[in-house]
Amino acid sequence: MSKVRVVNFEPTSKGENTHLYTIENNSGASVTLCDLGASVVSIKVPDKNGSIRDVVLGYEHIDGYEFDGTYFGATVGRCCGRIAYGKFTLNGEDYQLPVNNGSNHLHGGFNSFSRKVWLAVVDDKVPNTVLFTLDSPDGDEGYPGNMKVFVRYTFDDENVLTIKWSAVSDKDTICNLTNHSYFNLNGHKSGKVTENHKLKINANSFIPINSNLNPTGEITPVKNTSFDFTEPKLIGNGIDRKNEQICFANGIDHMFVLNNSDEEFVLAAEAEGIDSGITLKCYTSQKGVHVYTANYVDVLSNMGKDSATYGENSAFCLETQGFPDAANHKTFPTTILKANENYTQTTKYIFGINK
């Protein structure tokens, strides 16, 4: 039975102590987590030749996780994605959230869950698992309700990373949680993923955005568009620079509506790093997966872990989540969490090898 290894990391700018938690399975693969942002710091899995590769982007020091705007590996909340102009109405009351991304509220605001140090619980009786908890007070970044949040990470001997989110609030509020890991299955230092990664998405439709990067409220078929990943294709083949949607976001930064999303657990996406042979399957209980092709990543070697430099399209994200800006689109499935009701969602990232 493998255990969780805990080491000190670095203090935040506020003097808060942080730690790294490494779950290593019996085959030598591992996942390392940080209590700042309940974040994924590394995922090390074997390639087709048996060599171990770290397949997520990350920072060398704590200040990258604390201040940079990429959200590498972070737990994002209370509400992931953009809320148009930071405004929504709940139970007849208008709310104005902090605007931290142009004219929008993004990923929970300036002091979102990704910027907070969570309490970590490691129990030897629960193998291969780290549980993070956070108390978010009423009014936190403008959201109503005292909220208790839990994120449980488990990494098993089959190289399956399971993330389970749960939350409860004493008032009606908005809740839409995700993990913002950036995957490069050829290794985090291997450069662009556009021409050496295949991606398949279990979605016949996606949600278009406007020039402000907010959902239009429509749900559009992917057929005959560059957003059609219903069969595996190179990620770069989906970035059609002549497509207005791609131009708005400088790449893919869109929600894909999953097929069979009324089922309890569905396949969201499959990917493969062609050079490494490492594969990734993503299953989720959520309605959709937001795919982001690292369109604005610019991390210099003095910040990237292992002195890595990360640029545009150096990774892709599979952010399983509820519909974006749902509070402002009544036709979208709601992201309202009712008082004293339980929010629970689960995602599995399954790593394998295509030899």
Model region roles, listed by residue range:
Residues S2-K355:
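An exposed, glycine/acidic-rich loop-and-rim segment of catalytic or binding clefts
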